Amino acid sequence: MTKFVFVTGGVVSSLGKGIAAASLGAILESRGIKVTMLKLDPYINVDPGTMSPFQHGEVFVTDDGAETDLDLGHYERFISARMGKRNNFTTGQIYETVIKKERRGEYLGKTVQVIPHITDEIKAHVKRGAEGADVAIVEVGGTVGDIESLPFLEAIRQMGIEEGRSNTCFMHLTLLPWIPTAGELKTKPTQHSVKELREIGIQPDILLCRADRAIPEDEKRKIALFTNVPHEAVISVVDADSIYSIPRMLHDQMLDEIVCHKLNLLARAADLSSWNRIVHALKNPKHEVNVAFVGKYVDLTESYKSLTEALIHAGIHNESKVNIHYIDSEEVEKHGTGELEKMDAILVPGGFGKRGTEGKIAAIRYARESKTPYLGICLGMQLAVIEFARNVAGLKDANSTEFDPHTPHPLVGLITEWKNADGKVEQRSEDSDLGGTMRLGAQKCPIVPDTKAFTIYGAEVNERHRHRYEVNNHYVDKLEKAGLVVSARTPTEQLCEMVELPSEVHPWFVACQFHPEFTSNPRTGHPLFNAYIAAALANRKA
């Protein structure tokens, strides 16, 4: 029988519920417990796929093609379980399911209400996502007190009763703000947050108290007294240099012991040696490299969360500190590539829309001509192909139909027919709905021998995709004759998956249509990013 840990948040948002939940998952997994994780998002969007990165941050794509919250990326980086469509759902999905059932007559003419119909559907989704695990850690998005969160909080309250108190544990994350004029941490916001949670019918078993400094014991005792939480279950979560030190911080305060005791779990002692090695490598790098990250959402780095973490992981495995320099591609358009001259490597990530693309193309041209190691991802590959077509293959004004529908040389275009993850053929056009109409999820494809891609991946690559446009096969032969190497293609449609320049032309120039950052983790890194940072090390500027 699966046991549940429900994680809620109070006082303010963005306290790090996802990191705290993932860290607990990592500790429990190190004790031999099979863990899965779920994220419940209270917004009405069906999924975050069509939301602006400025609104929501990164969209994390799972193996089965779900467009999900970025917290699922944290889950996969901290625990070994792979996330999927069942691990993240929204108010929009719940209401969509309930309304479809009502239209089919499944409620037998009853008045459809938030309680019990919406809450029952939430509970069914949670149980479905938790199947097969010893412990499911369920994070409820938003903040206690938000009107959007109420059906989710009511659903987990009911589960606390239905599953039994020895099978459920409630963990609440709050903020203890430091007031400089008073010279003290304030506990009142936490007291009020727990009071509001208790009014809903949930008594937290554990409090995780976020602060920018250590919490004095007398403050912990005060919190315990006024929140009805045992003193030992008031956990101090202070700001850390690295998120990968959080599992050790929580374990040192016996969080896993408290959870195991509450859930009647018998498990071996925790082994956090791999996390200790990761933190040691982060704190004691032998080298340092500077990477230019040329994008258009650089003012909000959460938009590229998995990519940033993948570079950090590669630094760990190259014993290097990776200094990521976020460069706005529109600034490159205005002021040129001078800022790139002091960089050891250049990266252009994925993205959508025309804005900033010419700046990215200028950065790619600089990387190619200066022989600076280059990694292009998704749009970063498409623009690398366009840059090569314009400046090497002689295809003047080559472009993508996404940016210029009337380009004389459509090097990149909308694929009009594609088999989705269920094997069904989808038709697409520029007028198709934006939501759920991309090539999504993990796909395998063979790699051409004697290429950098083959050295990195071996004979086959299996990575996740999230894009709507593809390199136009009609131009591939001309590009190859001009010197571009297509090192991986899809097995059926023969679409470009990876391109590179030969070693005699450029020391390290690789681009891919997929998103390798989604499968990187701190324990093993990722072969493509590991190779990229190794190339940056070899190219270090004096």
Curated annotation (Swiss-Prot):
Entry-linked PROSITE patterns: GATASE_TYPE_1 (PS51273)
Annotated Mg(2+) binding sites: D71, E139
Substrates-to-products reaction catalysed: UTP + L-glutamine + ATP + H2O = CTP + L-glutamate + ADP + phosphate + 2 H(+); L-glutamine + H2O = L-glutamate + NH4(+); UTP + NH4(+) + ATP = CTP + ADP + phosphate + 2 H(+)
InterPro entries, sorted: Class_I_gatase-like, CTP_synthase, CTP_synthase_N, GATASE, GATase1_CTP_Synthase, P-loop_NTPase
GO cellular component terms attached to this protein's record: cytosol
Active site: C378, H515, E517
Binding site for ATP: S14, L15, G16, K17, G18, I19, D71
Pfam families: CTP_synth_N, GATase
Record bears the keyword ATP-binding: yes
Keywords from the UniProt entry: ATP-binding, Glutamine amidotransferase, Ligase, Magnesium, Metal-binding, Nucleotide-binding, Pyrimidine biosynthesis
One Gene Ontology biological process: 'de novo' CTP biosynthetic process
Activity regulation info: Allosterically activated by GTP, when glutamine is the substrate; GTP has no effect on the reaction when ammonia is the substrate. The allosteric effector GTP functions by stabilizing the protein conformation that binds the tetrahedral intermediate(s) formed during glutamine hydrolysis. Inhibited by the product CTP, via allosteric rather than competitive inhibition.
Molecular functions (GO terms): ATP binding; CTP synthase activity; glutaminase activity; identical protein binding; metal ion binding
Binding site for CTP: S13, D146, I147, E148, K186, T187, K188, P189, T190, Q191, K222
Binding residue positions for UTP: S13, K186, T187, K188, P189, T190, Q191, K222
Biological pathway: Pyrimidine metabolism; CTP biosynthesis via de novo pathway; CTP from UDP: step 2/2
This protein's record includes keyword ATP-binding: yes
NCBIfam families, per the entry: PRK05380.1 (NF003792), PyrG (TIGR00337)
Free-text function comment from the UniProt entry: Catalyzes the ATP-dependent amination of UTP to CTP with either L-glutamine or ammonia as the source of nitrogen. Regulates intracellular CTP levels through interactions with the four ribonucleotide triphosphates.
Note: CTPSs have evolved a hybrid strategy for distinguishing between UTP and CTP. The overlapping regions of the product feedback inhibitory and substrate sites recognize a common feature in both compounds, the triphosphate moiety. To differentiate isosteric substrate and product pyrimidine rings, an additional pocket far from the expected kinase/ligase catalytic site, specifically recognizes the cytosine and ribose portions of the product inhibitor.
Full protein name: CTP synthase
